[in-house]
């Protein structure tokens, strides 16, 4: 059976500090997914990391196996900052993340691009299977619907523009020189926001200088690019510094700022790019993403009505997603049932034809008649069980689905050889292939008794 149970875990800005999010995101998403796939009982994995969240999801044989695998996700983060999510909680949360309802900036667009890139990484390493592929694809669909059918992102500030607004409120921007460290999506947003102010000049520093040059050439402000090798020289010239790299190390140390004039620094990177002790330097003001909350709240009120619309949209799409999973599970059980019946049909038709051939040669039409009769019998006999399995899935009766899989799928639930038909069960017990413990609860009593006695 290809389906399983989804389990999730998250460390995000709602409950965790910047330090705790950083701790949970010490490993990149690719490494997290690859590691989770090595855990017992895990068949799929997905992870997404941004500056204000680190999350992981798995598909497991059962909830216990899923929680056990995810226990290693953020072992050093305090319990109150780590949120475990059940199957349905995980799916609903994925939809909320993609729509921007879980973002620090309500409805911001940046998360959708980050979500898509996380999916690309997961697909690239083969971490997604039918369960999570359906979940993340639905999340992207809902995220795009939310932005095209509601005003959830109208008037929304990005994290980058919120950082620029905070700098303006704190120390002013007029005539100042700004340094942006990082030329990725976040760095680009910061640079564009700075260019729309009265800043005098923007310097973009990046490990790959060509990317920094591309931003410097496109923003509407005097700007130039430097490599990270030249960072020390330009740090002392800038009075506003914003970091937004995924470099994974401190790029600004206390000694880099000591002796400089008034310097306002916002560290948007995850992991952080600014050494915490830098905040102790005189004339240095160091802020992180937590400081942006007051800015984001200013524009959030106007989007609350849209947020309610998106919530209703999520409810609708969430129900559709659950129904698709139910159909998938029922279809798999039905497929196994028909495959098992087809196996028996082929064997019995072959036996019947051999016996009839001994009585005289059969024509092709006679052979076709016998085979067609067998097909008709199977379809008629399995029509009622097929309906029962679909009804069971619709009613969340997974015991019936599991029983069907156990009876009809030889590989379901382990490597125990399964008998071809119920009457063979006692003989299988005599051979030692199965025991009473291997049987589903609703196997007929007279058969179960024979197995137990065997």
Swiss-Prot record:
Domain of life: Archaea
Region (Disordered): 407-454
Gene Ontology MF terms in the entry: glutamyl-tRNA reductase activity; NADP binding
EC number of the protein: 1.2.1.70
Binding site for NADP(+): 182-187
Biased composition (Basic and acidic residues): 418-434, 443-454
Keyword Oxidoreductase: yes
Site (Important for activity): 93
Keyword annotations of the record: NADP, Oxidoreductase, Porphyrin biosynthesis
Any GO BP annotation: protoporphyrinogen IX biosynthetic process from glutamate
InterPro entries: 4pyrrol_synth_GluRdtase (IPR000343), 4pyrrol_synth_GluRdtase_dimer (IPR015896), 4pyrrol_synth_GluRdtase_N (IPR015895), GluRdtase_CS (IPR018214), GluRdtase_dimer_dom_sf (IPR036453), GluRdtase_N_sf (IPR036343), NAD(P)-bd_dom_sf (IPR036291), Shikm_DH/Glu-tRNA_Rdtase (IPR006151)
Signal peptide extent: none
Chain sites annotated for binding substrate: 50-53, 103, 108-110, 114
Annotated catalysed reactions: (S)-4-amino-5-oxopentanoate + tRNA(Glu) + NADP(+) = L-glutamyl-tRNA(Glu) + NADPH + H(+)
Protein family according to the UniProt entry: Belongs to the glutamyl-tRNA reductase family.
Stored PANTHER family: GLUTAMYL-TRNA REDUCTASE (PTHR43013:SF1)
Other facts noted in the record for this chain: During catalysis, the active site Cys acts as a nucleophile attacking the alpha-carbonyl group of tRNA-bound glutamate with the formation of a thioester intermediate between enzyme and glutamate, and the concomitant release of tRNA(Glu). The thioester intermediate is finally reduced by direct hydride transfer from NADPH, to form the product GSA.
Quaternary structure (record): Homodimer.
Domain note: Possesses an unusual extended V-shaped dimeric structure with each monomer consisting of three distinct domains arranged along a curved 'spinal' alpha-helix. The N-terminal catalytic domain specifically recognizes the glutamate moiety of the substrate. The second domain is the NADPH-binding domain, and the third C-terminal domain is responsible for dimerization.
Protein name: Glutamyl-tRNA reductase
């Amino acid at each position: 059976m290809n389906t399983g149970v989804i389990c999730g875990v998250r460390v995000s800005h709602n409950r965790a500090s910047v330090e705790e999010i950083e701790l949970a995101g010490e490993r990149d998403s690719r490494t997290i997914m690859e590691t989770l796939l090595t855990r017992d009982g895990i068949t799929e994995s997905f992870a997404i990391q941004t500056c204000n969240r680190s999350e992981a999801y798995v598909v497991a044989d059962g909830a216990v196996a899923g929680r056990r695998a995810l226990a290693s996700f953020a072992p050093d983060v305090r319990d109150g900052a780590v949120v475990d999510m059940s199957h349905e909680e995980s799916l609903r949360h994925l939809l909320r993340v993609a729509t921007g309802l879980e973002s620090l900036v309500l409805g911001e667009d940046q998360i959708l691009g980050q979500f898509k890139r996380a999916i690309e990484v997961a697909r690239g390493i083969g971490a997604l299977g039918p369960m999570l592929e359906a979940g993340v694809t639905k999340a992207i669909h809902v995220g795009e619907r939310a932005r095209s059918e509601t005003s959830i992102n109208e008037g929304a500030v990005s994290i980058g523009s919120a950082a620029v607004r905070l700098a303006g409120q704190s120390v002013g921007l007029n005539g100042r020189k700004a340094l942006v460290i990082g030329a990725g999506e976040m760095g680009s947003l910061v640079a564009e926001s700075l260019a729309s102010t009265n800043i005098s000049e923007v310097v973009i520093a990046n490990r790959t200088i060509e990317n920094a040059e591309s931003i410097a050439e496109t923003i509407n402000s005097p700007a130039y690019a430097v490599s990270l090798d030249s960072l020390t020289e330009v740090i002392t010239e800038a009075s506003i510094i914003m970091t937004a790299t995924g470099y994974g190390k401190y790029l600004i140390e206390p000694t880099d700022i000591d002796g400089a004039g008034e310097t306002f620094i916002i560290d948007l990177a995850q992991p952080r790019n600014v050494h915490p002790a830098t905040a102790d330097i005189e004339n240095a003001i160091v802020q992180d993403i937590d400081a942006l909350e007051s800015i984001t709240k200013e524009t959030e009120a106007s989007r609350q009505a849209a947020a309610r619309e998106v919530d209703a949209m999520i409810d609708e799409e969430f129900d559709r997603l659950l129904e698709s999973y139910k159909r998938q599970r029922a279809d798999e059980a039905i497929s196994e049932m028909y495959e098992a019946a087809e196996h028996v049909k082929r064997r019995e038709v072959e036996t019947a034809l051999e016996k009839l051939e001994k009585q005289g040669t059969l024509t092709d039409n006679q052979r076709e008649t016998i085979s067609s009769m067998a097909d008709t019998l199977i379809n008629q006999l399995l029509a009622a069980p097929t309906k029962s399995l679909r009804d069971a899935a619709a009613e969340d009766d997974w015991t019936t689905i599991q029983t069907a899989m156990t009876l009809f799928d030889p590989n379901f639930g382990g490597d125990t050889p399964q008998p071809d038909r119920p009457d063979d069960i006692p003989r299988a017990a005599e051979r030692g292939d199965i025991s009473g413990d291997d049987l589903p609860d609703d196997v007929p009593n007279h058969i179960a008794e024979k197995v137990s006695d065997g």
